[in-house]
Amino acid sequence: MSQFQVPLAVQPDLSGLYDFPQGQVMVGGFQGPGLPMAGSETQLRGGGDGRKKRKRCGTCDPCRRLENCGSCTSCTNRRTHQICKLRKCEVLKKKAGLLKEVEINAREGTGPWAQGATVKTGSELSPVDGPVPGQMDSGPVYHGDSRQLSTSGAPVNGAREPAGPGLLGAAGPWRVDQKPDWEAASGPTHAARLEDAHDLVAFSAVAEAVSSYGALSTRLYETFNREMSREAGSNGRGPRPESCSEGSEDLDTLQTALALARHGMKPPNCTCDGPECPDFLEWLEGKIKSMAMEGGQGRPRLPGALPPSEAGLPAPSTRPPLLSSEVPQVPPLEGLPLSQSALSIAKEKNISLQTAIAIEALTQLSSALPQPSHSTSQASCPLPEALSPSAPFRSPQSYLRAPSWPVVPPEEHPSFAPDSPAFPPATPRPEFSEAWGTDTPPATPRNSWPVPRPSPDPMAELEQLLGSASDYIQSVFKRPEALPTKPKVKVEAPSSSPAPVPSPISQREAPLLSSEPDTHQKAQTALQQHLHHKRNLFLEQAQDASFPTSTEPQAPGWWAPPGSPAPRPPDKPPKEKKKKPPTPAGGPVGAEKTTPGIKTSVRKPIQIKKSRSRDMQPLFLPVRQIVLEGLKPQASEGQAPLPAQLSVPPPASQGAASQSCATPLTPEPSLALFAPSPSGDSLLPPTQEMRSPSPMVALQSGSTGGPLPPADDKLEELIRQFEAEFGDSFGLPGPPSVPIQEPENQSTCLPAPESPFATRSPKKIKIESSGAVTVLSTTCFHSEEGGQEATPTKAENPLTPTLSGFLESPLKYLDTPTKSLLDTPAKKAQSEFPTCDCVEQIVEKDEGPYYTHLGSGPTVASIRELMEDRYGEKGKAIRIEKVIYTGKEGKSSRGCPIAKWVIRRHTLEEKLLCLVRHRAGHHCQNAVIVILILAWEGIPRSLGDTLYQELTDTLRKYGNPTSRRCGLNDDRTCACQGKDPNTCGASFSFGCSWSMYFNGCKYARSKTPRKFRLTGDNPKEEEVLRNSFQDLATEVAPLYKRLAPQAYQNQVTNEDVAIDCRLGLKEGRPFSGVTACMDFCAHAHKDQHNLYNGCTVVCTLTKEDNRCVGQIPEDEQLHVLPLYKMASTDEFGSEENQNAKVSSGAIQVLTAFPREVRRLPEPAKSCRQRQLEARKAAAEKKKLQKEKLSTPEKIKQEALELAGVTTDPGLSLKGGLSQQSLKPSLKVEPQNHFSSFKYSGNAVVESYSVLGSCRPSDPYSMSSVYSYHSRYAQPGLASVNGFHSKYTLPSFGYYGFPSSNPVFPSQFLGPSAWGHGGSGGSFEKKPDLHALHNSLNPAYGGAEFAELPGQAVATDNHHPIPHHQQPAYPGPKEYLLPKVPQLHPASRDPSPFAQSSSCYNRSIKQEPIDPLTQAESIPRDSAKMSRTPLPEASQNGGPSHLWGQYSGGPSMSPKRTNSVGGNWGVFPPGESPTIVPDKLNSFGASCLTPSHFPESQWGLFTGEGQQSAPHAGARLRGKPWSPCKFGNGTSALTGPSLTEKPWGMGTGDFNPALKGGPGFQDKLWNPVKVEEGRIPTPGANPLDKAWQAFGMPLSSNEKLFGALKSEEKLWDPFSLEEGTAEEPPSKGVVKEEKSGPTVEEDEEELWSDSEHNFLDENIGGVAVAPAHCSILIECARRELHATTPLKKPNRCHPTRISLVFYQHKNLNQPNHGLALWEAKMKQLAERARQRQEEAARLGLGQQEAKLYGKKRKWGGAMVAEPQHKEKKGAIPTRQALAMPTDSAVTVSSYAYTKVTGPYSRWI
């Protein structure tokens, strides 16, 4: 990018560097209206080494002016070391080459202009651009400008000259009388141009060859100093002749010096900041030009051209000659024989021979063209023309195009830009780059190569032009600055194209610009366009385009007034450019007009200079660009309009445009100039349109253009395309300057102001820019605003490169790195530090992130004033707190958020809180920045109260929690959100958000986006949520706008474009999405994907007990800035007041931050891990389901057999339980049960396969889709049969028996009843097991419960508790008892509800153990339930027996044991399984699980037989999701099947277990574990089948037991987390009961106050306590922020709901980016098609073809997939169910899921 920028930058730099006298600098290369400075030219010729410092003429107005204006860039920025632009000698403003031409006129004032321009442009551009500045100057210099400057010396280029009103017509009117001057110099100018072109070529070579300034004699420096001092004395635009004459120094020496200066050699006393000394460069250029003019005055300047120039830029004779001159350059390219110069150029420039030849041809043509003196000829030889009085006006442009195309033009242009204060070098250059860059710069390289000299370097120069062309373009843009059309010139002329400036000027000022500028502009435009086109073809050109962005510099006069030295502009070019592109208007006139806007970009040209370097390396061969044949006709046509345009000088930017446009040459919009705009915004908006037809026109006009095409057929083709696309009028418009004006607006086509003489060129130039890269193209050819719209999208890129494709969008042809820069939105909004001298270097790491969109000021008092104005209240209403950035994050030992200082609302009077940071070491305008704004009364209280209730109710039931990385510490081991997945803190996302898959909005492919999606199908709830959020967004936006207007504006910029991705009901929608965080602890993070200069707006809603000011609630959540500490003083610097705040509580200083340490037993799995596991689980589940469905009978039989397996506890768990469960499965309707269980628990879980932590499934269950800790929030379960529990758990614990199962009565759900999260507490309260059973199934006693609908069940569950509540057995036994009744009803009801109830029952079933504990209830319930629901079971011992046996172990109570024993005894392994299965399965399984949950259900479940299923349930109960899982797949099945047999089996174990409670539990857990290990093995298939029959999610015993195992392991973690999981496995039920409380106790014991943070005062931790209905605004993208963990998070009744409104940085596409997605899909489809064709060609099968296409991404995986598929096909149907799942499903789901695009259709 820098390379591309370099050319443009060079010009700007030159302007800055060569601002000897400010005025001169302004003129830059275009000292004269278009004349290159004679000295400059000479220097250029000589390579710049021999250039001598030119002297001020002492006669022009600027020279006679003794006081600085104080407003120009030179005055305001003394670093440029440039004399005030208004005092810059007119002579010095002209390039040396121009002076030579102008010397004829220069003496009349033209010379000075030309010389100044030459110097500036030449030196600036030559290093990178190629032609020496003088060459550029001579070619492109606009005599019209010179005319204008006649009074002031060099007004034409003077556009850059602050003093010369004639500059660009801004400083003064173009003088018609100057026309004679120009005319007089016309011949010489032509010669000068030719010389300049040669000089440029030579200079480019020399510049590269020259190693140091050592070659320069100190005498040169002395001369320079003398002249500079003289110039400083007289800033008037006195004639440049004096300077020129001084240029008598050895030309070689001057050229060498120039080359060295351009390479960084500065005079000993130079204090310039830039790499070059703008003044010295300008002076050298002036010298060289003056010498060139002296020696080259003989050069035929197009005489005709001069008069037209006088008449007006439009004068075709002048312009055409220039065009001819330029064009001739092109023709020589075509037929130029390979010469030594060409070879040397090729060698030195490392360019192709063709390019070198083209350059040489251009050089020759430029010199020859001046002779013809017809407009074409002149156009062809812009440099010479620039030298001539008439040429000067156009000359700047021509000169830019021809002489400095390679090197000089950019520099010369910069010189001009610097010379004229109106053209800040940077901005003007960019403008010219845009306007001229498009037209003139391209033309100049082509024309200037031949025109300045036929040296072999012309090609190199041309190439440089490509690289340098951007410089030229810059200079062209600068030139518009210098030109009367200051608008454009201002932006670009100073920096990049002084010559172009004259063109705009001429356009603005009809007299000067009319004829000569017309021709010259045409020639320049043609050349520039051509070159631009080439640049577009090559990356460098794209950069040049960026310079063109600066094409809008104002007239030199305008720029001069700004006083920003043209050379300086490079510093500001980027911004300026962006601004300038808007400035350029449709025509050259418009360009001139825009020039003033461009003015600022003058400085940036210096930066552009860097791009120049890149430009020097033309990516796009100049040869093609040089072809001007096609442009010639356009140039001629454009010429006619030019005169008119010239007659009416457009604004500077427009002037630049008009200059370029004046030249009928079609600008080469397609030329991509990759040069930063002089202003520093090297990139022009990609869509920016630049009209630089003028250069093209010039090329066309010039006969040389014809010859050039032969040099390169492609070039010729390009020219023709330009002609066709741009038409003749393309020369007229000055879009280049316009685009330059708006370089920043990348995809914007800015039409240059239309010149009065020509309609807006249809071929507007499109400027595509990003970062430092700008691409100029003709995409906008036929649309005035074609810029943005014309820019093709990525998807539109042609598969094969074509000229038309390139013209449409050069970006398509950029290399990947460049394209990445252009395509990466983040690159576009890089932070830009303010320019201040407070510190040497801004280090954000030390002073904190820098941003000002929240507000900034020099002092805290200024912030107060600012915020008082914004809020509308004063005094105490606004509270400002100072914070200090330390960079040391405050966090707990586990890496979780803590607070050290808490800022609270102290009184109701306080309305607004602002946190401000003083940037260490700064005392500038942005020394203090606002980092946080908190409006305590952000929304109406009523609205906040309503929102809190609505969101709590809705999200608790239907919310789908989002797993966020910030929810965990770095190790993923903390449980800050809470351990209960049903109540833990969670965040919910709504609105549009980013999708990496779509690379855009996640709704890109959604026909009916559900922005407020909830789980399940709940349109009404979603509508409520939508209304709530939309209303809130509408309510908050105005406040946001009032408190942070800049941030607000940044966020609504693209609202109209991407309104689909915005929230809000009224215009002004700054938000795209909202995240609802409910008791969610967000660990320290930055919202990296938020809009770059946007903010997050957080609306806080708090619990009822935290809505009063002055009261600190028991539990609260704070918003923390971990890297800041509180200042010791208040906003007024008073420590006492600060201490008073602390004592009053307004600031709470903490000495510790005690928080319970909640830790996960093992690190939580990442989203990716969970996804992979989910896929695997889903595949296995499908396989199991298929197997179950396919062989239910077989499974049943196996289940029965398993049930008959040994009753040994271990066996029962493994085999016995499995058998029992299997038998029950058989007895129970497998499908019904399966579906019931499956849908009750697993169905939901599976529906959230991608929920991640939010999954309802058991975190540790193998069967769960995701294996994650229960800590992860689980989505609200779908209502069971329409029943929605108000509890976080699924109604009846879909996934098993969640401890807080909503289905269960609140008493059971309560931590006390269930033992929070399966904690011992619930187990302790086990007595409610029966009650739980009753509540779960009111008909526990009867089978009715199972039959009840889900809602009824839930209701019953809630109510019936008392019935089975008998607390006789507080342990799991009670739960078991209730389970028994449940089992029987559940088994009865095969309906899903039954299944649901069975889940409940299952829990209860497990509770039959409780019945054991409760001898009464168990026998009664068990017998009743067993008998009623399962006669066999009851007979066998009834559920009581079964459960009793099972529960006996867990319960450990003698009663239970006895009962259980009896029951278990009654329940033979085989019988009870059989009986229980039916009812137990549906009921028992679920019941058992729930009951177990309440107790240390795990212990109960651990009971051998039942344990596996019930145990799972119990575990699940501990971890509701687990139960769900088990209930769904494992628990439920296990419950029933295992219940029977396991209970029987577990009788012995269980009885002992019952007796030894904890021991039993241990046994149970151990057996479960063992069973998990064993069972899968012994009865894996049968169990699996049985499970399947039951509809269990587990595919096999392994799965079931695996789930159990995982649960067991998980359970342990759960126990730790929930308080029961850990102990139950190894200890008994009793212990399990204890385990919950124990864990809690342990957790309570594990507290941390993060002492270490409070020992170091520099560790941050400033927190604010957001109040109810408050609105907090902060830049979350830049500031590290966090929210503290709550002591007892419960999202069912959240302590704090924070609604975070934000806008993603890239959600700026209409219709959610559907068009982009479709385009991408088309592209992928095409690729897929190609792959298929390739596969067909290679004879690959369909499968192989798929793999073939995906190999790169999937590698082995893909191969495996095909194999699987083959196996699948080969495998018999009996295996088909499983195989397809494994191979096809697994592979496809896995691999294809990862693949984007066309692959999806292969799934």
Swiss-Prot record:
A biological process (GO) of this protein is: positive regulation of transcription by RNA polymerase II
Gene deleted: what happens? Neonatal lethality. A germline-specific conditional knockout produces females that are normal in growth and morphology but display much reduced fecundity in terms of the frequency of successful pregnancy per mating and the litter size. No 5hmC signal is detected in the late male pronuclei of zygotes collected from the conditional knockout females mated with wild-type males. In contrast, deletion of Tet3 from the male germ cells does not seem to affect the change in 5hmC and 5mC.
Listed under catalytic activity are: a 5-methyl-2'-deoxycytidine in DNA + 2-oxoglutarate + O2 = a 5-hydroxymethyl-2'-deoxycytidine in DNA + succinate + CO2; a 5-hydroxymethyl-2'-deoxycytidine in DNA + 2-oxoglutarate + O2 = a 5-formyl-2'-deoxycytidine in DNA + succinate + CO2 + H2O; a 5-formyl-2'-deoxycytidine in DNA + 2-oxoglutarate + O2 = a 5-carboxyl-2'-deoxycytidine in DNA + succinate + CO2 + H(+)
Where is 2-oxoglutarate bound in this sequence?
A: R964, C1077, H1119, R1696, I1697, S1698
Name the organs or tissues of expression.
Highly expressed in germinal vesicle (GV) stage and MII-stage oocytes and in early embryos.
| Residues annotated for substrate binding in this entry | N1090, Y1702, Q1703, H1704
Q: How is the cofactor bound?
A: Binds 1 Fe(2+) ion per subunit. The zinc ions have a structural role.
Where in this chain does the entry annotate a coiled-coil region? Answer: none
Q: Residue ranges under compositional bias (Polar residues)?
A: 369-380, 543-552, 1393-1403
Q: Where is this cross-link: Glycyl lysine isopeptide (Lys-Gly) (interchain with G-Cter in SUMO2)?
A: K490, K1196, K1227, K1405, K1569
Which residues does the record give as Zn(2+) 3 binding sites?
C836, C838, C924, C992, C1001, C1061, H1712
Keywords assigned: Chromatin regulator, Chromosome, Cytoplasm, Developmental protein, Dioxygenase, DNA-binding, Iron, Isopeptide bond, Metal-binding, Methylation, Nucleus, Oxidoreductase, Ubl conjugation, Zinc, Zinc-finger
Q: Which InterPro entries match?
A: 2OGFeDO_JBP1/TET_oxygenase_dom, TET1/2/3, TET_oxygenase, Znf_CXXC
> Which Gene Ontology MF annotations are present?
5-methylcytosine dioxygenase activity; methyl-CpG binding; RNA polymerase II cis-regulatory region sequence-specific DNA binding; zinc ion binding
Q: Where is this region: Interaction with DNA?
A: 993-1006
Post-translational modifications reported in the UniProt record: Monoubiquitinated at Lys-1002 by the DCX (DDB1-CUL4-X-box) E3 ubiquitin-protein ligase complex called CRL4(VprBP) or CUL4A-RBX1-DDB1-DCAF1/VPRBP complex; this modification promotes binding to DNA.
Quote the entry's note on domains: The CXXC-type zinc-finger domain mediates binding to DNA sequences containing unmethylated cytosine or 5-carboxylcytosine in 5'-CCG-3' DNA sequence motifs. It mediates binding to CpG-DNA.
Q: Which family does it belong to?
A: Belongs to the TET family.
Q: What is this protein called?
A: Methylcytosine dioxygenase TET3
Which gene holds the coding sequence for this protein? Answer: Tet3
